[in-house]
Amino acid sequence: MTREERIRAAIAGRETDRVPVAAWMHLSEHDQDPISLAEAEVELTEKYDFDYIKMMPFGLYSTQDFGNQVKIYCDPYKEPIVQKFAIDGPAGYDSIRAISALQGTYGKQVEFARELAKRRIEGTP
């Protein structure tokens, strides 16, 4: 069975040649560069023959563009931490403005998704 066939069969409750498997972790040493992260995730998937790729972007990407000050280590053993929150009380919510999904930290995740789609082995969901 291919990876995709295995997953589709498992979801449908049909027999598979083996249990579909995947594992994921934050790849902090790569997650500030969309291309490096896409390459590392594909490499991890192929090394362990995982059946699908679970995207693991920078964990605080959804907050940084709104003003959170984040300490980034790029170290697999240190996760990023928020040093200062953008909102420190109820009135702070009035300062939230819409941002472009194609720029900033969020935009890097969109680029990561595009790069991952280009680099993944065909048939790997």
Annotate each language-model stretch with its function.
Residues 1-125:
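Catalytic cores of TIM-barrel enzymes
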